[in-house]
Amino acid sequence: MTRLRSLGTGTAFAIAAIALVVAIAGGTIAGTIARPTPTPSPTPEPTAAPTPEPDTAPLVFALPLVTGCATDDAVWVVSDGGGIGRFDGTTWRLADPTLHSLVGAVCESDVVLAIGPAGRVLTIDDRTKSIRADDLGIVDLFGVSILPDGVLVVGSEGAVLRQTSSGWQPYARGLDEDLFAVVGFSGTSAWTVGSNGVSFRLEQAGWRQFATGTTATLRALAATSPTEAVAAGDGGVLLRFDGRWRPLDSGVTSDLRAAARVGPVTYVAGDGGVLLAVRGNDIQRVDLATTCPLRGIFAKGTDLWIVGSSGTKAAVWRRQGDKLDRWGAC
């Protein structure tokens, strides 16, 4: 203490100032050393953009489309010598590009069953997105109908087969004519029509023939019960059953190929773009503004769907009341 005083007041202040500067500098250095090096930001990994699904709708409408049907979630169309198309309510796409010869199709819930020559039966599961092919023999299949407990198909030379949980079994004997259309109500009730104007009704005792008054080939059939049906065929032949078959004046000479019931109306379609609306004995022409052969029609709820094709040009129409939509060009 004595010695510090002897230095004088000015000297003491100078020493204190130097000490303060050193202390500040030391703190700055220490602070610089203590500050952690910033962690570099990770470089983001590049992500590939999803590849857009190709538009295969044009391929669908280049197929020889013949008919279709509707599952719970989609509309399906099949072709005779091409692939299979699917419409999800917004977009058409080629669901299966494999070449198939198919002439008829029915849908139930999420399953499509399509038929064709040489006993070919194609089962499409819309839920699992799978396709299974079965062959029922050399018989050509032309018509198919859903039953409450299975499926009924008809074909060449009077062939009738029924599918149940036990598999496929013959379901008629003594029928010789080619059968082109069938509508089934149960295992003991159905209608079928075919070549030479034949018609048969399935009853408890078996298949019973009903005279139609024509020898024209009958290719189309729609029915709501065993006592109410409409059949149509070559040369514009149109018949209505109300206890017996009665001829109706179709007003056309085109071959009529398909029929479907929507509400109280039976629609009949055929060559030359012909579409007829049959209400009882009243018949009206529906103009689709096409001359394309109409090969198949079916219902989805109250909507009528029409399928037409000529060579590699095809189209599908949807009729909702007075509104008409079309996809494709035919």
Regions found by a protein language model. Name each.
Residues 1-7:
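Terminal targeting segments of Actinobacterial cell-envelope proteins
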Residues 8-330:
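Residue-level hotspots at or immediately adjacent to binding/recognition sites across diverse folds
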